[in-house]
Structure formats: structure tokens, C-alpha cells
Amino acid sequence: MESQVAAAGAAETEAEAGKRPAMGSASQGSLVSAPKGAVRWQLLRQVLKQKQLDDHLRHVSVRRFESFNLFSVTEATKKGTEKEAGVWVQYTSIFYPKYSISVRHNSGSLNVEDVLTSFDNTGNVCIWPSEEVLAHYCLKHSHIFRDLAVCELGGGMTCLAGLMVAISADVKEVLLTDGNEKAIRNVDSIIACNKKTGVFKTPKISSRVLRWDNETDVSQLEGHFDIVMCADCLFLDQYRASLVDAIKRLLQPTGKAVVFAPRRGNTFNQFCNLAEKAGFSLQRHENYDEPISNFHSKLKKEGSDIYEENLHYPLLLILTKTG
């Protein structure tokens, strides 16, 4: 369900990653060349013209790798009206098949202003590999959420990981958030649809717009959550410090954050440095799940040109608030 908008935004992110010498990744020189920079504008023009991306344009997008094959995705029965943009699909865990949820993917288009000026559109129309991995992790470790208040930050158009917590754990409360209003309207629809089926284990599941750099958004929920989690939210320079601050303020005194993100040059390390300065204790894990590690090793061994560890393999970071 990859969108033209997501591909355009992702290609720009990849291009920016390749331009920054401070990122310190040996692979960056291969990411972007002058022709690929030009391709970014081809992608944007495709968005404006509402055309399908051709194979060449898809190849240069960071979004070209789509999944670790942790969920089966099948088209669901039409949930909304014909006027509503989007396709309803059923996400079912491959490893824990009793857990399944209906989500709506946005198949409509965003306008130019959405692409260029909205708060982080990267998660607005697709589920990124890191979100998929976080969702799988939540199912595998559902016991850690028992009787706790949980918040997902930057969950995009579906907040899939937070939804998995709500259907698998005996959780006290789940709040699904993103900084983009269109994303949260879609999440509202997903919650309403699935409430009708009785799939949630808690009645206290809700969503709201939460921008990490907005004092009002953060202060209203200060000290409320036992666990805060996010996936692939570390690469935007202008929001990284705000994300660390928001996590710290949203957590209770002994709270923890569960973060999945690829290295993306030096952006993962930059976030870790900010978190340490903010007083968090850190635990980093590269091998946190055998099937994911095996799939990762297989892709590396194959030398696939659609998969790049620096951009696609999520590391696990556990932050513990130490006061």
C-alpha cells in the first residue's frame, strides 16, 4: 500500500542522509549521487501529477524495502462509505495468528502543502518496517504492558504497534498519537471500527494529535504513562531533541521507553546521546528476535539491492527514566 507521497518523502530523506558528512556512514556515498538528487524531484512531480511511480523511481526510494514478513495482509470487507479514501486491510500476525486487526490504508492523494509543510508525513500512508517490528515485539512481550498506561508516539496513519498492545495485553490504557491531524483522523476510524468487533482488551483506547515540540500537547499528559514507544522517529534533526524531552515528560518517574529505529547514518547515535544527557539509562540491542535476525542475515547474504542495513534494520533501544 505504498503511496506516491511516502515514496517522495522517503527519497528526500535518503538524499539528505547521503549529503550530510557528519552522519559518518561508510555506505552513504552509494546512497545518493547527482542523478538520484534529480530523481527526488521526479518523485515529487509524480505526486503533483498523481501518477504511479515507475520501477526506476521506486528503486531509489528508501521505502523500497517494505517488510520483515511478520504480518499477513489481506484485503478486508469494505468498512466505510464509497466517498472515503482508503482501503481496509486485515493485519494478522504470522507468529501469533490469533492476533489480527483491521486497519485503513490511505489510498488517496495528499496535496502539495501536505507534502512540503505538514508535520512529518513519513508515516502517513504506509507502515514502515520499524513499525512492523515494534508491533511484533509488542505481541511477543505483551506481558510487560499488564496494568500499565501505554502511549505510542509518531504512530502514523495506523499506529499498528499500539493497536497490537490493545488487542493482546491486559493493559490499563492505550493512547495512540501522531503529530499529523489527517493521520489521527484515520486512527480514530480504525479504533471505532475495531471497537465494534470487541477485539480490544481495554475499553480505554483513544487517539489524539500530539506534537513533541508543542508545550500544550505534552504538558496535558505529563507524567501519565508507564511505557512510551515509537518506531523510526529519530531521523528528523529538527524534532530529535523535542522527542527526547517529550518522552521524558510523558513518563512516570520509573517509566520506560521502547524505541525501534535503524541507524540512518549517525541519527540513532545522536538520539542516544541526547537521551543520556537527559538522564535516561540506555540498553541497546541488535539481536532481539531470532526470526527477524535470521531474515536480516538472509537479506545481507543475498546482497539484495532493495535492502540496506543502515536504512532498514531497526535497532532496539530501551530508555529507563532515572529521575
From Swiss-Prot:
UniProt EC number: 2.1.1.60
Keyword Nucleus tagged: yes
This protein's UniProt keywords: Cytoplasm, Golgi apparatus, Methyltransferase, Nucleus, S-adenosyl-L-methionine, Transferase
GO BP term, example: mitochondrion organization
GO molecular function annotation: calmodulin-lysine N-methyltransferase activity; heat shock protein binding
Matches recorded under InterPro entries: CaM-Lys-N-MeTrfase (IPR025800), Methyltransf_16 (IPR019410), SAM-dependent_MTases_sf (IPR029063)
Cellular component, GO annotation: Golgi apparatus; nucleolus; nucleoplasm; protein-containing complex
Tissue-wise expression: Detected in most of the tissues examined, with the highest expression in the brain and muscle (at protein level).
Known catalytic reactions: [calmodulin]-L-lysine + S-adenosyl-L-methionine = [calmodulin]-N(6)-methyl-L-lysine + S-adenosyl-L-homocysteine + H(+)
Pfam name, any one: Methyltransf_16
Bias (Low complexity): 1-12
Keyword Nucleus included in the entry's annotation: yes
Enzyme class: transferase
Region entry Disordered, spans: 1-31
PROSITE patterns, A to Z: SAM_CLNMT
Function: Catalyzes the trimethylation of 'Lys-116' in calmodulin.
PANTHER family reported for this sequence: CALMODULIN-LYSINE N-METHYLTRANSFERASE
Subunit structure: Monomer. Interacts with HSP90, probably as a client.
Family named by the database record: Belongs to the class I-like SAM-binding methyltransferase superfamily. CLNMT methyltransferase family.
Protein name according to UniProt: Calmodulin-lysine N-methyltransferase
